[in-house]
C-alpha cells in the first residue's frame, strides 16, 4: 500500500506526507489569503457606502459591484484549487500512490471574507482520484493536531495536549525537538487510519518538508478589470 496523507489548512493549504520514504510537501496557502485580503480591501469601502445608501438604484449598483468582485475572487480560488489538485494527482501518478487520505477541514467563516469553497476542492480531488483509480478517504481530524507523531502517540484524547504547539506552525516533540506542526498533523491522519504502519516505530518517516508555491491569477499579475 502506497499512501499519501493530506492535512488541509490556510497558511499552508496542504501538508502532504507519505509512507514511501519521501520528504513531505507543503503547498503554501498564501494565494488563498491574498485573494481574501484583496477582496476585503476592495469591497470594504463599497460595503460602508452600502450601509449608508438610501437610494434604491445606488444600493443595487453597490450590491452588484460587491457580488461581481466576489465572483471574480471565487474564480481565482477555483483556478488555484484546480492547479493544486493537478499537482497532487501528478505526484500520486509519478510515485504510484494507490491511497489518498485527507483530513476533513473545519472551515472558519468570517463575514468580511469570501467563504473559501473547500467542499469544491474535496469534490474535485475525489473525482480526479476516481478517474485514476486512487482510493480517496476523508478522515475525521479529531485529536490529530494535539498529539505527537514522532513520539509514537496515537491520535486519542489520552495523549492530546495542544500546548506543545508552541507557534502556529511549530510542534514541540517530547525530546524538545521542533517539527512542522502541519506535517505532524498530516502524519497523524495517516496513523489514525492505518495505525499498523507504525507498529515498528517511525524511523524512515521524514520531518523536513519541501515547500511548494502554486501561483495563479493576481499572483501572476493577471488582474481582471
PLM features: residue spans?
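Positively charged, helix-rich recognition surfaces that bind polyanionic ligands
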Residues: 1-225
Amino acid at each position: 500500500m502506497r499512501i499519501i496523507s493530506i492535512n488541509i489548512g490556510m497558511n499552508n493549504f496542504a501538508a502532504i506526507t507519505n509512507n514511501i520514504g519521501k520528504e513531505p510537501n507543503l503547498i503554501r496557502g498564501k494565494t488563498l489569503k491574498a485573494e481574501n485580503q484583496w477582496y476585503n480591501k476592495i469591497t470594504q469601502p463599497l460595503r460602508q457606502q452600502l450601509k449608508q445608501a438610501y437610494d434604491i438604484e445606488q444600493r443595487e449598483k453597490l450590491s452588484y459591484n460587491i457580488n461581481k468582485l466576489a465572483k471574480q475572487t471565487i474564480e481565482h480560488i477555483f483556478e488555484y484549487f484546480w492547479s493544486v489538485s493537478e499537482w497532487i494527482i501528478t505526484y500520486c501518478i509519478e510515485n504510484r500512490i494507490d491511497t489518498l487520505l485527507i483530513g476533513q477541514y473545519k472551515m472558519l467563516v468570517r463575514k468580511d471574507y469570501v467563504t473559501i469553497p473547500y467542499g469544491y476542492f474535496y469534490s474535485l480531488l475525489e473525482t480526479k482520484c476516481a478517474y485514476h483509480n486512487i482510493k480517496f478517504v476523508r478522515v475525521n481530524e479529531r485529536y490529530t493536531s494535539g498529539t505527537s507523531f514522532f513520539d509514537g502517540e496515537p491520535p486519542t484524547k489520552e495523549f492530546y495536549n495542544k500546548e506543545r504547539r508552541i507557534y502556529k506552525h511549530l510542534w514541540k516533540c517530547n525530546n524538545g525537538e521542533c517539527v512542522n506542526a502541519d506535517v505532524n498533523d498530516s502524519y497523524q491522519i495517516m496513523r489514525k487510519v492505518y495505525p499498523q504502519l507504525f507498529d515498528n516505530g517511525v524511523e524512515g518517516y521524514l520531518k523536513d518538508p519541501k515547500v511548494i508555491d502554486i501561483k495563479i491569477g493576481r499572483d501572476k499579475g493577471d488582474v481582471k478589470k
